[in-house]
Amino acid sequence: MLCSCGAEKNLKKAEKYLALGEYYDAATQFKQAYTKTSPKEREKRGQYALKMAYCYEKTNSVQKAVAAYRNAIRYNQADMNHRLAYARQLLKTADYKQAATEFKAVLDSMPDNTLAKNGLVSAQNAPQWKKEGSRYTVKRMDVFNSRRAEFSPVLAGDQYEKLYFTSTRNEAQGNELSGITGTKPGDIFVSEKDDKGKWSKPEVVEGGLNTEFDEGACALSPDQREMYLTQCQTDPSYPRYAQIVTSSRADASWGKASLLEITRDTLSSYAHPAVSPDGQWLYFTSDMPGGLGGLDIWRVRLTSAGLGGVENLGEPINTPGDEMFPTFRPNGDLYFSSNGHPGMGGLDIYIAKPDKSGHYVLEHPGYPLNSQADDFGMTFEGVHNRGYFSSNRNDGRGWDHIYSFENPEIIQNVKGWVYEQDGYELPAAQVYMIGDDGTNLKLSVKGDGSFEQVIEPNVRYIFLATCKGFLNHKEELRADKTEESKEYVLQFPLASITAPVLIDLSLIHISEPTRRTPLSY
């Protein structure tokens, strides 16, 4: 009798935490309720196990989630949706054989279920994908990592000498542990690379950017003067949802972040911002109504007057599963992570490349960029296919860490410099790039007056540099096909419209005046 009363007390606490989205605390209470309940009360035990499994999923405690689902199945409390969730967790443990068995059982009852279909494809093909491998190489970057979590790296600086990322390490602000994750709330940290290429010890970003709440998954505008980031506030009385906030940089310091109101829907989450290379669109993750299920990737236009309308990216990017962490390669390729497409388990990274008609074509980059765990948050070192990403592979606690990646490839790119004729850089300039293959881009200029862009062989390009107060400057370029990477350098010295221009009058011929009749006007 005493055990039963104790279990009810734990259950009441667990349901309260669950309603607030505090999954770590909820899982702890559900586990205690489960332990205090007699095995003879099979229905109760099975229901508690289901709640535990759901909370463990949310906190990335994969092995605990698998064990909880097995208990729910043992007590005959798991329906086919629970069996589907169990199978998807098995993928994350690389137990592909058992996962395939579960997916087949689900498909016997729900033959049209997209997640079960894609899950079975994953379970049947992942071992071969891992065996085949790819040209990617990955390496764990311990210089950035701690005994807690680090994720969503973002390279910054004119020479990509800064790396921003989120971490829940001890140096993060706040003293209380999060009821959602069981760790300290995350803060934005930064590491800087010296002239010898050595990265410094990460430090929390000073100023008003970080708070006692969770800050994470940041992105920068093309001019790197605006930061978009995810913030998760908490409240003991009602659930709070992730939101996107913005911070402006004054000199070297980031200011206090302010809310970016994407819609007036306060019951949906908005997270994982990414800015398109042309600076015209903000991509983000949300569970707002109108999606394909789970978390979807959306976008909203950025204008001088504010935000435009919101668009769901739709198929083939979004699925009934979760699509998250959009990022861009400078060439316009969209990278994102999903657990709804066929993959190796957990969140896999996918590449969405627009074809000539503007529709996206998806590519799975394979192993080792992807693994059975969660892989996400790509950032690139300029035009090169190298940089950093985050993954919780090989971490028993499910915590994310930062890895480097590189995929050697033949790249032809142009690097340009826009400056005054006197020599000073013009970071306020814009460069328009037009190719005879239909290319029509507006390129942003960095703080040192430079820009970079990948180009295709056998295409004739025209580059036009413009800046308020200066005359335009045009350059033309055509790159031949080559067997190795090559960089073309273009110079754009702009003349001021106020600077005096010397004219040699001896070169001007003045003819005799002609008498005009009224009809000649």
What is the predicted role of each segment?
Residues 33, 71-72, 105-106:
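Canonical positions in the second alpha-helix
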Residues 505-521:
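Residue-level detector of conserved catalytic or cofactor/ligand-binding positions
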Residues 20, 85, 92-97, 108-417, ...:
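Short, conserved micro-motifs composed of acidic
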Residues 436-450:
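Short, acidic Ser/Thr/Gly-rich low-complexity loop/linker segments typical of extracellular
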